[in-house]
């Protein structure tokens, strides 16, 4: 009995163990519902929360931009989940810039790649790396791995059948973009679009996911993620976590590609 009491007393004197009581890093997910992207949240929130439990990281989920009025330094990465930069007010935009310049990581998912109006926040557009042009209707296509050394590709087949909105982009806005995944335009119809709109595709080089170092931080971008069912797909969630892991830690890139 005396031994148990002694052990309890010693335990009270010991400092807390945050590395065990808390996750390996902390992530903020910004998921502001918008006109075309709101149904996905019912699926995405519990699945991303499960991802956090599975991989042992702390997660804060926000439906609004209020966290950008406070201190972002506790976050190893910020995920802009179908939430574009124009959702942020001017002061909040400055907070994101300061966060990245201090070494923070950003994961931009699908709708986050579209900024309206174009040219209103050049820093954010350069962070994304490419300017969105248009997309055809949702179709099934073949996705190719372009960089098997990057963790957002780990576990994916060399040719992956996926259904999504295949965003088209202009040329790179910055140097150093590393393409992770591309879509094979011969596997779908890039011109299948709504009346009054024109889509032509991008040709052989049609990136749909990439990463780069930007203004002191790490940025992973994936154009995939429109269908709500995507967030219930194990392969897609592995793709998403691989990019998040790198953005948060800088780890995971293999020395060689298989």
PLM segments and residue spans:
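Catalytic beta-strand/loop cores that center a nucleophilic Ser/Cys/Thr
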Residues: 133-215
